[in-house]
């Protein structure tokens, strides 16, 4: 059997000019949906697996597009997908249909919101329990919406967000762009352990801004089998042009799920306290240098081999990646989501106003992998504006050339982060 590669943590801001909703109380200065957060959403395991499959297919496609530059990369398809799900709650007509296609949603109805909630809760609950006394990992998936204090919004939109994403709207005066950016940035920095800073730029806000939507994913976990820090030493790493560089390389001897084929070396590193793993995938240099073969590898549902328990002697570089702001619109365009970024967009479900379109979707991300474990986080901004107008010898696995990594929950299959290391 094979699994498909899929898509590291995200924060999305959606700004919009809007029209028709409840009035906040002076006490809370919040807009709250009428429906309480659903802590026990109804779902079948089949539905949940359909959602995970759609997210993972989306993740593969987005990563394949972003990885074309062949640079160090980390993104969070999980957070991007969740942010798009919240935006989808306000989409209508052909705009909604294109988003459904791009997100690989198998349903036309609104069940995606209930299932996103269910998957979030499944993952968060698994983070709270360690196995055999081990320390549970830290996983946070918070949401926050920020509304212009004079704006009005559709009650149905607010209800979907309160019931499935556990958020209302905090009121801001977007005319004071600097204060609005400061408030949102403070929230983002707190949720990402200060790793994602200055996400919101005052230039994003104006008198026409009505809504900012933020989602963050933060993950931190120790390895189940830590690397021996004393064994870390410089070792050669061959980059794609054939040049060798000396990089700090960690070493571990342990029973691990692994596979070696002519085209791909793969090893799975479990985290302590649950079902989360990091999977390291090292394609052959021939595959890296053959765009057609690499594209087929990303696109194929048979992209990943079945892993087997092996006595592994592993060498791999430690690495830390902090991306610059990445424009995600080209990747979404390439996956069929086009109308949302044009004057023909229809986000009337947000406010009843049809003159809204998405002008920006960008993401920043961070990951640090060392002998003790992993810390990863990401943030994305989407701006919606008004139209202006075992056994035997150890299996030797040496990660000494460009590789791909992904952080995945083995219980659900959900991929939280994916990236590539071209030059540690």
List each model region and its residues.
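Detector for small/aliphatic-rich hydrophobic stretches
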Residues: 2-174
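Non-catalytic interaction/Regulatory regions outside core domains
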Residues: 8, 18, 27-36, 352-355, ...
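Short glycine-rich loop/turn motifs
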Residues: 59, 263-266, 364, 400-404
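Non-catalytic, conformational "gating/processing" segments within enzyme and secreted inhibitor domains
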Residues: 70, 109-284, 307-390, 394
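Feature captures eukaryotic membrane-trafficking machinery centered on endolysosomal pathways
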Residues: 74-96, 268, 393-424
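Short beta-strands and strand-coil junctions in structured, solvent-facing domains, enriched
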Residues: 195, 287-288, 414-415
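Internal alpha/beta scaffold segment
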Residues: 283-308
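Short, solvent-exposed amphipathic alpha-helical segments in soluble enzyme
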Residues: 296, 383-385, 422
């Amino acid at each position: 059997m094979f699994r498909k590669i899929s898509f590291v943590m995200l924060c999305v801001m959606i700004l919009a000019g809007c029209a028709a909703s409840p009035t906040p109380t002076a006490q809370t200065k919040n807009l709250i949906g009428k429906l309480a957060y659903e802590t026990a959403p109804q779902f079948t395991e089949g539905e949940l697996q359909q959602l995970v499959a759609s997210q993972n297919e989306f993740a593969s496609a987005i990563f394949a597009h972003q990885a074309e530059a062949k640079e160090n990369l980390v993104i969070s398809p999980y957070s991007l997908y969740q942010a798009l799900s919240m935006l989808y709650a306000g989409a209508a007509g052909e705009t909604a249909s294109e988003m459904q296609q791009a997100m690989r949603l198998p349903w036309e109805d609104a069940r995606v919101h209930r299932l996103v909630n269910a998957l979030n809760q499944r993952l968060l609950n698994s983070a709270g329990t360690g196995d055999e006394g081990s320390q549970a990992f830290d996983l946070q998936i918070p949401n926050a919406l920020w509304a212009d204090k004079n704006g009005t919004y559709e009650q149905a939109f607010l209800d979907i967000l309160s019931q499935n994403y556990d958020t209302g709207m905090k009121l801001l005066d977007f005319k004071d762009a600097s204060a609005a950016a400061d408030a949102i940035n403070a929230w983002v920095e707190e949720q990402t352990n200060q790793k994602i800073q200055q996400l919101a730029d005052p230039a994003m806000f104006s008198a026409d801004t009505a809504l900012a939507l933020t989602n963050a994913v933060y993950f931190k976990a120790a390895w189940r089998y830590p690397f021996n820090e004393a064994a870390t030493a410089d070792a050669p790493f061959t980059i794609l042009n054939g040049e060798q560089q000396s990089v700090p390389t960690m070493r571990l001897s342990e029973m691990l799920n692994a596979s070696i084929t002519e085209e791909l070396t793969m090893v799975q590193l479990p985290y302590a306290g649950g079902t989360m793993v990091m999977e390291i995938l090292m394609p052959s240099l021939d595959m890296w240098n053959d765009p057609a073969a690499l594209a087929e590898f990303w696109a194929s549902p048979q992209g990943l081999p079945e892993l087997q328990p092996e006595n592994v002697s592993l060498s791999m570089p430690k690495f830390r990646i902090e991306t610059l702001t990445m424009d995600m619109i080209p990747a979404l365009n390439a996956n069929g989501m086009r109308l949302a970024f044009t004057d023909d967009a229809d986000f009337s479900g947000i406010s009843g106003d049809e003159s809204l379109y998405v002008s920006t979707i960008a993401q920043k991300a961070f990951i640090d992998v060392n002998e003790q474990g992993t810390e990863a986080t990401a943030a994305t901004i989407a701006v919606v504006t008004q139209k202006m107008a075992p056994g035997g010898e150890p299996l030797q696995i040496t990660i000494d050339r460009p590789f791909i990594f992904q952080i995945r929950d083995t219980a659900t299959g959900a991929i939280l982060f994916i990236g590539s290391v071209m030059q540690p």
